[in-house]
């Protein structure tokens, strides 16, 4: 029996931001953290990325404590280091310094090798009217789908 694929998305990010470029990064995790992710007990709500001394870190990513973990369990909202190539890190850091741009986690998944990966995007914040426009387009698409189903 094939295990269910883990695909945790930050739905709010696509509403609040316009994605310019995306990167797939590895995450430095402890044993109980990867076990919780495999159970689907993670959330990307209110998560953001920042640089410290040329390294990319993710803050506020919630990974629930592992139920079967002992006293050695992890802290649910600790900061976690992201792993990217130096070239990608430099490119992201330079672009992230520009006003209006930020680095946002978009999706957390487990690849074919069983490693946890985080898709991060270089993003620009949307204005209020852009958000309304996105909602209108989404509603229009939904209406069109309903019409074609009949």
From Swiss-Prot:
InterPro entries: SmpB, SsrA-bd_prot, SsrA-bd_prot_CS
Disordered, as annotated region: 130-150
Gene Ontology CC terms: cytosol
GO molecular function: RNA binding
rRNA-binding in keyword set: no
Cellular localisation: Cytoplasm
Alphabetized HAMAP family for the sequence: SmpB
Full protein name: SsrA-binding protein
Record organism: Phocaeicola vulgatus (strain ATCC 8482 / DSM 1447 / JCM 5826 / CCUG 4940 / NBRC 14291 / NCTC 11154)
């Amino acid at each position: 029996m094939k295990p269910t694929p883990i695909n945790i998305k930050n739905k709010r990010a696509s509403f609040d931001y316009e994605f310019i470029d995306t990167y797939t990064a590895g995450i430095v995790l402890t044993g109980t953290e990867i076990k919780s992710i495999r159970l689907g007990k993670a959330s990307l709500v209110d998560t953001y990325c920042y640089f410290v001394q040329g390294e990319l870190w993710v803050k506020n990513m919630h990974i629930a404590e592992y139920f079967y973990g002992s006293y050695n369990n992890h802290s649910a909202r600790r900061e976690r280091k992201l792993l990217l190539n130096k070239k990608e890190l430099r490119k992201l850091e330079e672009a992230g310094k520009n006003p209006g741009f930020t680095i946002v986690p978009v999706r957390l998944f487990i690849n074919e090798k069983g490693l946890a990966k985080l898709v991060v995007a270089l993003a620009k914040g949307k204005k209020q009217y852009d958000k309304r426009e996105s909602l209108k387009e989404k509603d229009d698409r939904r209406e069109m789908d309903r019409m074609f189903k009949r």
